[in-house]
Amino acid sequence: MQQFEEVRTILEKAKKITVLTGAGASTESGIPDFRSANGLYADANVEMYLSRGYYNRSPKEFWKHYKEIFQINTFHQYKPNRGHRFLAELEEQGKDITILTQNIDGLHQVGGSKHVIDLHGTLQTAHCPKCKMGYDLQYMIDHEVPRCEKCNFILNPDVVLYGDTLPQYQNAIKRLYETDVLIVMGTSLKVQPVASFPQIAKREVGATTILVNEELTGQEYNFDYVFQNKIGEFVEGLSSIK
């Protein structure tokens, strides 16, 4: 309980809080961890189907697999969970908080967070590769192969595909170097370059670092506080302190 008290005090005093979230932030909403043994990435061909090269070569087939892999026709059923709401509430209290998320579900924004950097893009939108007009998830659901209404070009999803660079990487690094506190929630820290963020925050920036993850990551030495809990349990622990 002492750790919860200390972390609550740290969050109350912090000027700039940065939160890195992974799949564990969304599994409590019922969204499968795509990288788990039984997840949607378990198919050996998934990396090919979700690659920039495949989209460029076979955009119609790409959209078929994209919709199947991410099950976008049922995506509206997923709702923000207590972890999403907790982060949004911190922002509503006036905290300068930015979320760096590896998730592509858009639930941080749906939950009310305003300052979110989608490191791997988002399933919620797509755009025309020619005129850049944006389209929402419902438009993608309604059209087997979604095309721009103006240009008739097949839409480009706003998820970062294999073979793409991370367009938001520099923005994320800039935020890391400004932060007082880094909270890492629901990620195994196995995927680079995101896996290096805790070390940057602790060793180079001198920020207080907090890990919330059910399983150990092998990077516990980069954290001042380690909570081997579900995110909902962590939030409950903080909330129980009077």
UniProtKB/Swiss-Prot annotation:
Binding site for Zn(2+): C128, C131, C148, C151
GO molecular function: histone deacetylase activity, NAD-dependent; NAD+ binding; zinc ion binding
Pfam entry (one): SIR2
EC class (word): transferase
Lineage top rank: taxon: Bacteria
Reactions that this protein is recorded to catalyse: N(6)-acetyl-L-lysyl-[protein] + NAD(+) + H2O = 2''-O-acetyl-ADP-D-ribose + nicotinamide + L-lysyl-[protein]
Cofactor binding remark: Binds 1 zinc ion per subunit.
Chain residues that bind NAD(+): A23, T27, F34, R35, Q102, I104, D105, H120, T187, S188, N213, I231
Keywords: Cytoplasm, Metal-binding, NAD, Transferase, Zinc
Gene Ontology CC, one term: cytoplasm
Binding site for nicotinamide: F34, I104, D105
Annotated localization: Cytoplasm
Cofactor section: Zn(2+)
Enzyme Commission identifier(s): 2.3.1.286
Domain Deacetylase sirtuin-type: 1-242
Active site: H120
Family: Belongs to the sirtuin family. Class U subfamily.
Function statement: NAD-dependent protein deacetylase which modulates the activities of several enzymes which are inactive in their acetylated form.
Protein name as catalogued: NAD-dependent protein deacetylase
Gene source species: Bacillus anthracis
